[in-house]
Amino acid sequence: MELKDNALSSGSQTLGINARPVPQVRVALPDYWTFAGGWLGIKGHIAYGKFTDDGWQKDFTDQKSKYTEDALYHSKAGYLRVGHAEKTRLSLELGLEMATLFGGTSYRKWENGQLVGVKNGTGLSSFWNAFIGGGSDVGEDVYKNVEGDNLGSWVARVNYDAPTWNLGVYADHFFEDHSAMFHLSHNGYGTGEEWQVKKENRFYLYDLKDIMLGAELTLKSCPWARKIVVEYLYTKYQSGALYHDHTANIPDHLCGTDNYYNHGIFTGWQHWGQVMGNPLYTSPLYNADGTVQVKNNRFVAWHAGVSGSLSRALDYRLLATCQKGWGTYGNMFPHPRRNLSLMAEATYSIPKSGWQVAAAAALDKGSLLGDNVGLQLTVVKKGVFK
């Protein structure tokens, strides 16, 4: 997870760490490769893989609602850093993260209520379309979209490194299509026999409302509160509440109701029932009706995290999140649902042994996730067993 603290952040919206990892082949520049005298740096990756939750999807849905088999995975990301690490305290990081779920077989209900499997593309052209965001899905005719479930985030971070502290302020803007990626869509189609012809250079502009904003403060000489993170997330807009494909009679083309993390053909941005981005999007694993879909993707949330050391051997971590959810555009909650999540963790490192023992306690309170309590014990060995 890039440009955010992996231990304290609520998580990236595209390439998060909430779900089981997807087995993949990856080519990457994991650290910044600098040029222009050290003032510029780039890093990134390209990856292809295969999802492994076919059996889970069949069991969870009982093969009575939409699921996929043998789906493939693609992700890519590129980041640019501006600023010299040794000559300036200020630096800027910009990035684009994108991912695609494609291939395999999609099982979904048709108008007669029967569950029918559709074989998606798996040839070289499908791998290329996943990379460039092109092509169209099997069965699409009049209204063609790109092949697979495509999504991503524009990310940015400004850093200031002072002698005794470091501050990073960052943003993560998620998108599911061009309306949120570029904030515009073509809206100049003709009518009648020319309803599929782009007659005018007219575009519909979309607001920048959905965003994740965060601040990360590191106190270099304060071990008891070494790092503090605060984040705000807003996802209610989703390019607006209206969706309309242009027709012969009504040429207006509106691309709203983006329905984050869901997809009409595939089972959305999830793996083994857990969303693969930010966990504040309610994971399908919580669904009591056995459907693989995200039922709450329109929400406002505040998140905070603090970590530090109480002694040389004892570290701690505290997380707190409050959230208000409205469901989805297609299935709104009758009343907004709220949730409060808290977690406290302590980690003890046994001196000169390589052993660590961590204990954590967490709870959820509210109507969004219900009232839950959890405990976790972790034992870690670093180095060689003797």
Spans of model-derived segments:
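Long, internal scaffold/assembly segments composed of regular secondary structure
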Residues: 92-94, 102-247
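Extracellular loop and loop/strand-boundary signature of outer-membrane beta-barrel proteins
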Residues: 9-15, 61-66, 140-144, 198-203, ...
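Outer-membrane beta-barrel "beta-signal"
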Residues: 24, 371-386
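Short loop/turn motifs that connect adjacent beta-strands in outer-membrane beta-barrel proteins
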Residues: 32-44, 81-93, 160-168, 219-225, ...
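Internal, well-ordered domain-core segments that constitute the primary functional module
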Residues: 2-118
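Membrane-embedded beta-strand positions of outer-membrane beta-barrel proteins
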Residues: 44-46, 92-96, 167-171, 228-230, ...
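C-terminal structural cap/anchor segments
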Residues: 235-328
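Transmembrane beta-strands of outer-membrane beta-barrel pores
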Residues: 1-2, 31, 48-54, 96-102, ...
